[in-house]
Amino acid sequence: MGHYKANVRDLEFNLFEVFGRQEILGKGIYADLDVEAAKDILGEVARLAENELAASLVDSDRNPPIYDPVTCSVTIPESFKKSYQAYLDGEWGRLDTPVELGGMAVPPSLRWSIAEMVCGANPAIHMYGATFSFAKLLWHMGTEDQKKLAKHIVDNAWHTTTVSYTHLTLPTSDLV
């Protein structure tokens, strides 16, 4: 076990005993998500955060991305690639993706509970996972061309990022 231990009981207490999320789950826009499914999501993200995501924290912290100006490429630790791929394989970013783009209607309070675990385990994974949040922003506020880009971002888990150099941009998919 790594450095991170998710406090699922605290998250469930806040979601269901303080904020009463059981009153909205299984109904209306959240009809496809009941309390049991929400708790299952919390449990699975906790397992992922404590294991696969936390596993690369120290290595990726001690070995930051390195830009090679000759090849215009960025190198990141293999352990980080493996952690991020585990996040992508679980399709956890789709919980913050519009339904129209293949996402799932999830209350913001549940999304923030998930974000707490991912960020606690490995903040860089949380930032890379923001790819899907950026797509959501483009989908809701963008032009028609930007909405096409949002779909591309979600379909390919891709976006352009700047890594320490204001003139450098490349697809995140090239890093993984």
Located regions from the model:
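Amphipathic, small/basic residue-rich leader segments at the start of a protein or domain
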Residues: 1-125
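An acidic- and aromatic-residue-enriched active-site/binding cleft used to recognize and process polar
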Residues: 97-100, 130, 165
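N-terminal glycine-rich flavin-associated loop
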Residues: 126-144
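A glycine-rich phosphate-binding loop feature that marks nucleotide/adenosyl-phosphate handling sites
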Residues: 131-135, 155, 168
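A short, Trp-centered hydrophobic/proline-enriched beta-strand micro-motif
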Residues: 156-164
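Conserved small/polar residues in nucleotide/adenosyl-binding loops
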Residues: 166-172
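Acidic, Ala/Val/Gly-enriched low-complexity intrinsically disordered segments
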Residues: 174-176
